[in-house]
Amino acid sequence: MGRKDKRWVLQRKRDFYYKLAKKLKYRSRASFKLMQLNEKFNVIKPGKIVLDLGCAPGGWMQVAREIVGDKGFVIGIDLQPVKPFEYDNVVAIKGDFTLEENLNKIRELIPNDEKKVDVVISDASPNISGYWDIDHARSIDLVTTALQIATEMLKERGNFVAKVFYGDMIDDYVNLVKKYFEKVYITKPQASRKESAEVYVIAKRYTGKKWEEEDKIKRVKKVENEDNELLAKKIKEIRKLKSKK
């Protein structure tokens, strides 16, 4: 283990919410973020159906289940396997939520005839490169996909919560969300680390408007096999061109 890794482990052990999560048997310190967001914005209510995109290790699903209770239902999906829950009304699928075949699996699990959910939540993060321009662009890409899925899966007047890394593309993203929801907020819960660039977009009351393909935010597509430094330079060049227009 390198110095940075050791420092990260030590910092986490000193973290108040990390310790509290261990004590209360939550799977992640992120559980407290959703608690705080829901206390402030009341996006999840008892008896509702919740879809969690990028749910591993399951901390948000635990909190969602506590809120919806026995009469609600919580479905999660993640590329990583999620340890099964003790409740019958909490189910996690291993898979890529950007694939239509996996969305169809989710629809099969939704316990209503219209196959829609009341709330879509996402605490997902992109693969971190260490280059801020790339990581911000990838975060916008991921959260835009989450928004598109929300417009496909939500009941009318449903709610959406998603994490995004703050940066120069966030205003465009928030304006995009406003096309589909009546109320949109940006916030940072107390449980988020102060040094973290993460913020949360809270969108309430989905209008029912169908997703428009032209609403894909113009950005550099994720290129897994391309050198990160080269990709960062490309993003900066694109921004310079946009600023001159």
UniProtKB/Swiss-Prot annotation:
Enzyme Commission code(s) on record: 2.1.1.166
Family to which this protein belongs: Belongs to the class I-like SAM-binding methyltransferase superfamily. RNA methyltransferase RlmE family.
Localization (cell): Cytoplasm
Residues at the active site: 163 (proton acceptor)
Primary subcellular site in the record, as a coarse category: cytoplasm
HAMAP family with a match to the protein in the record: RNA_methyltr_E (MF_01547)
Gene Ontology annotations of biological process type: RNA methylation
Binding annotation for S-adenosyl-L-methionine: 58, 60, 78, 96, 123
Name of the molecule in the record: Ribosomal RNA large subunit methyltransferase E
Role, per record: Specifically methylates the uridine in position 2552 of 23S rRNA at the 2'-O position of the ribose in the fully assembled 50S ribosomal subunit.
Reactions catalysed, as given in the entry: uridine(2552) in 23S rRNA + S-adenosyl-L-methionine = 2'-O-methyluridine(2552) in 23S rRNA + S-adenosyl-L-homocysteine + H(+)
Keywords, alphabetical: Cytoplasm, Methyltransferase, rRNA processing, S-adenosyl-L-methionine, Transferase
Entry superkingdom: Archaea
GO CC, alphabetical: cytoplasm
GO molecular function ontology, one term from the record: rRNA (uridine-2'-O-)-methyltransferase activity
Species whose genome carries this gene: Methanocaldococcus jannaschii (strain ATCC 43067 / DSM 2661 / JAL-1 / JCM 10045 / NBRC 100440)
Stored Pfam families: FtsJ
Gene that produces this protein: rlmE
